[in-house]
């Protein structure tokens, strides 16, 4: 039996890596946006009618009472507004936007659960903005590698053992190593 073909399978992919504090928007069916997440959140937003979509990657929900010192891009509110405005500039309509959110893991034992705060912020922000979350994968103890094809809305998530994660999402090794969870999750 032949598998389902995807538009992005018809040629070489153009990979765009979205790092902490960044946001990217595209309608090109060959573009795949990628990121690796620990406690950070990536929001994948798109207008399914136009095929315009984008991804952001933020570290913290907000700056709290601290001065952000020019680091506003690290915070969720700014990152979400930047992504939404980028989509609208490309021709997406706000009333058609839908979201998929990923990340928010708890990778450091004994510390506050920044990942849960990040996930709660993203859910609250999107609800307040009237943007439906059509799928999500947040929380847990694993890092995630996320690939998003903005034109089709397809997302692939791979859980990453913390020992194999990039340095920015790695946590100290516990005395007893957790069992590896190597699940793939693909959302359409």
Swiss-Prot record:
One of its GO terms (molecular function) is protein-glutamine glutaminase activity. It comes from Caulobacter sp. (strain K31). Its EC number is 3.5.1.44. Belongs to the CheD family. It comes from the Bacteria. Probably deamidates glutamine residues to glutamate on methyl-accepting chemotaxis receptors (MCPs), playing an important role in chemotaxis. Coiled coil: none annotated. It catalyses: L-glutaminyl-[protein] + H2O = L-glutamyl-[protein] + NH4(+). GO terms for biological process: chemotaxis. The lineage of its organism: Bacteria, Pseudomonadati, Pseudomonadota, Alphaproteobacteria, Caulobacterales. Disulfide bonds: none annotated. Keywords: Chemotaxis, Hydrolase. InterPro entries: CheD-like_sf (IPR038592), Chemorcpt_Glu_NH3ase_CheD (IPR005659), Cytotoxic_necrot_fac-like_cat (IPR011324). Pfam families: CheD. The keyword Hydrolase applies. This is Probable chemoreceptor glutamine deamidase CheD.
């Amino acid at each position: 039996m032949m598998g389902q073909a995807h538009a992005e399978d018809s040629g070489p992919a153009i990979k765009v890596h979205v790092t902490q504090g960044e946001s990217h928007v595209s309608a090109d069916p060959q573009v795949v946006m990628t990121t690796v997440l620990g406690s950070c959140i990536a929001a994948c937003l798109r207008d399914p009618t136009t095929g315009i979509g984008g991804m952001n990657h933020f570290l913290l929900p907000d700056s709290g009472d601290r001065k952000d010192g020019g680091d506003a891009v690290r915070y969720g509110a700014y990152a979400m507004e930047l992504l939404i405005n980028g989509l609208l500039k490309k021709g997406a309509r706000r009333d058609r936007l839908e979201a998929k959110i990923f990340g928010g893991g708890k990778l450091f034992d004994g510390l506050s659960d920044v990942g849960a705060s990040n996930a709660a912020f993203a859910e609250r922000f999107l609800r307040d903005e009237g943007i439906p979350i059509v799928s999500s994968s947040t929380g847990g103890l694993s890092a995630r590698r996320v690939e998003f094809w903005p034109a089709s809305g397809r997302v692939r998530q791979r859980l990453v053992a913390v020992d194999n994660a990039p340095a920015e999402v790695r946590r100290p090794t516990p005395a007893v190593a957790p069992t590896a969870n190597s699940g793939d999750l693909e959302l359409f």
